[in-house]
């Protein structure tokens, strides 16, 4: 019996030592697993986003709960409750700490999201999406260009009106330059690739049958060379055109952005400036056209060669030669012919004593045909002015043909 008691006591000691070994190994395994899990969640918290952190916290909670259940099962099987009770306590405290840290991070993320959404709402509510008379502290075009009282708002109003006048001024200058360059091109033929019809280099061509002079026709230039190989003067003109177009386009787009602020003060400033500047520079165009037409008539009268080849319509027709009239008359009576010759001599002497108007007095009043031609030209000029006033005067259009003649 004593041997059996000793054997049973030895078995109990072996079992207790085995259970202690198993418990200690389980505890060390649980602690290692918890430490590795905590390290994993910390690294994931630092590298992952807010949504990934929330999913990692859920995974950690499930892992900790499964490990706690495993440790509780091992402690009940081994019977060593005291040694295993400390392990769930530490794991619970670690889980509580991690949960609190995760809740803090989630709170920070929610606060950040709420603050950003609040800023977005403030910005969206600060922008105008419809016409409004409110202009106070609303920036237009630039960050510091805003008005907080009526005086500053009126100053911005005048700024946009002046910008509209500058835009129309650039268009008017471009139109004047195009007319001037076109007139100079046609008058002097310096910058044109077209050879003049009256050029001396072309020579003179005669028709032997009809015995009259045929002027040389201009040569047709190469279109590609005119477009891609311009002269230096044409290139200089293109640079001026590019500068004017760039500046005017920039101003009109800035005015468009000002109207997109939906502030009525700025919208009416742009509309008022464009309307007034259009009327003003349209009047300037009409005055310039009238002035150029008068200058053209004066230049034509000064360069007119006189009667016989009159081009201005202000020189009288030459009187018929009395000698030629006397020679054309036919008669059989010799005395009658002599009398006519005497009369013609008397007429010649009287004609020599009289002053020739074209030689001493210059241009007289226009004859009936000249008056009719002048009236026709004036009617054409009035019709052209009416057409220009009724339609939009595009600055890119070439001037009328009446400005291309000398």
From Swiss-Prot:
<dbReference type="GO" id="GO:0005634">
    <property type="term" value="C:nucleus"/>
</dbReference>
<feature type="repeat" description="1">
    <location>
        <begin position="9"/>
        <end position="27"/>
    </location>
</feature>
<feature type="topological domain" description="Cytoplasmic">
    <location>
        <begin position="272"/>
        <end position="406"/>
    </location>
</feature>
<feature type="region of interest" description="3 X 19 AA tandem repeats of S-M-X-M-X-A-M-S-S-A-S-K-T-X-X-S-X-M-X">
    <location>
        <begin position="9"/>
        <end position="65"/>
    </location>
</feature>
<feature type="compositionally biased region" description="Polar residues">
    <location>
        <begin position="349"/>
        <end position="375"/>
    </location>
</feature>
<feature type="topological domain" description="Extracellular">
    <location>
        <begin position="174"/>
        <end position="250"/>
    </location>
</feature>
<keyword id="KW-0812">Transmembrane</keyword>
<keyword id="KW-0813">Transport</keyword>
<dbReference type="GO" id="GO:0016020">
    <property type="term" value="C:membrane"/>
</dbReference>
<dbReference type="GO" id="GO:0005737">
    <property type="term" value="C:cytoplasm"/>
</dbReference>
<comment type="function">
    <text>High-affinity copper transporter of plasma membrane that mediates copper uptake under low copper conditions. Copper transport through the high affinity system requiring CTRl supplies the iron transport multicopper ferroxidase FET3 with copper, which in turn is required for ferrous iron uptake. The energy for translocation is unlikely to be directly derived from ATP hydrolysis and the exact mechanism driving the transmembrane transport of copper has still to be determined.</text>
</comment>
<feature type="cross-link" description="Glycyl lysine isopeptide (Lys-Gly) (interchain with G-Cter in ubiquitin)">
    <location>
        <position position="345"/>
    </location>
</feature>
<protein>
    <recommendedName>
        <fullName>Copper transport protein CTR1</fullName>
    </recommendedName>
</protein>
<feature type="region of interest" description="Disordered">
    <location>
        <begin position="318"/>
        <end position="406"/>
    </location>
</feature>
<keyword id="KW-0472">Membrane</keyword>
<feature type="modified residue" description="Phosphothreonine">
    <location>
        <position position="356"/>
    </location>
</feature>
<keyword id="KW-0186">Copper</keyword>
<comment type="subunit">
    <text>Homooligomer.</text>
</comment>
<keyword id="KW-0597">Phosphoprotein</keyword>
<keyword id="KW-0406">Ion transport</keyword>
<keyword id="KW-1017">Isopeptide bond</keyword>
<feature type="transmembrane region" description="Helical">
    <location>
        <begin position="153"/>
        <end position="173"/>
    </location>
</feature>
<feature type="transmembrane region" description="Helical">
    <location>
        <begin position="251"/>
        <end position="271"/>
    </location>
</feature>
<feature type="compositionally biased region" description="Polar residues">
    <location>
        <begin position="384"/>
        <end position="395"/>
    </location>
</feature>
<feature type="modified residue" description="Phosphoserine">
    <location>
        <position position="369"/>
    </location>
</feature>
<keyword id="KW-0677">Repeat</keyword>
<feature type="modified residue" description="Phosphoserine">
    <location>
        <position position="349"/>
    </location>
</feature>
<keyword id="KW-1133">Transmembrane helix</keyword>
<dbReference type="InterPro" id="IPR007274">
    <property type="entry name" value="Cop_transporter"/>
</dbReference>
<feature type="repeat" description="2">
    <location>
        <begin position="28"/>
        <end position="46"/>
    </location>
</feature>
<keyword id="KW-0832">Ubl conjugation</keyword>
<feature type="repeat" description="3">
    <location>
        <begin position="47"/>
        <end position="65"/>
    </location>
</feature>
<dbReference type="GO" id="GO:0005375">
    <property type="term" value="F:copper ion transmembrane transporter activity"/>
</dbReference>
<feature type="modified residue" description="Phosphoserine">
    <location>
        <position position="344"/>
    </location>
</feature>
<keyword id="KW-0187">Copper transport</keyword>
<dbReference type="GO" id="GO:0015677">
    <property type="term" value="P:copper ion import"/>
</dbReference>
<feature type="short sequence motif" description="REP-III">
    <location>
        <begin position="304"/>
        <end position="315"/>
    </location>
</feature>
<dbReference type="GO" id="GO:0005886">
    <property type="term" value="C:plasma membrane"/>
</dbReference>
<keyword id="KW-1003">Cell membrane</keyword>
<feature type="topological domain" description="Cytoplasmic">
    <location>
        <begin position="1"/>
        <end position="152"/>
    </location>
</feature>
<dbReference type="Pfam" id="PF04145">
    <property type="entry name" value="Ctr"/>
</dbReference>
<feature type="region of interest" description="Disordered">
    <location>
        <begin position="71"/>
        <end position="117"/>
    </location>
</feature>
